[in-house]
């Protein structure tokens, strides 16, 4: 039997076969913990009845920290000013409607590249995603008012580990997420090398 919230109403359904939990790196451990699956001491402290002890639930959280250096360009046009203007957005929309081309047909990044932070490595550990635009933060409502591009670089094999822990028994309460970015010497070194290599490529 499964309990879930829908429109602020707690509902129940039954499954005749297996249940597949697919709520991502944050949601899945949160659901497991509120369901009584996880570290027995942590769950007991929150008043949650233990169903199955599994200490690894919520542990070993891994993520790729992305550094977003921004480079101004001269003599070239980025998408910044076009995206910032009403007329520019109109032209982008018309180009897509009539030609199925332009910025609306692009993916999140227009170029991807891999490299090694250390030549002795068997496989690359650095990845770049390059965008022909720039902004202060991802998801910002306004791009910069100058032409620039963003070569985002990340360590794709970080050694830093974080965790996801619930704070109470209510599954609607956001869990505590600790990412622990750059908590190891290795990750700090790779980050520095990634930014240094980015400058070398661009400049």
Task: For each feature predicted by the language model, list its residue ranges.
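Short, hydrophobic/aromatic-rich segments at coil-to-beta transitions
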Residues: 1-3, 148
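Structural recognition of the beta-strand scaffold that forms the well-ordered cores
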Residues: 21-22, 52-53, 165, 178
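C-terminal catalytic lobe of FAD-dependent flavoproteins
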Residues: 46, 101, 108-203
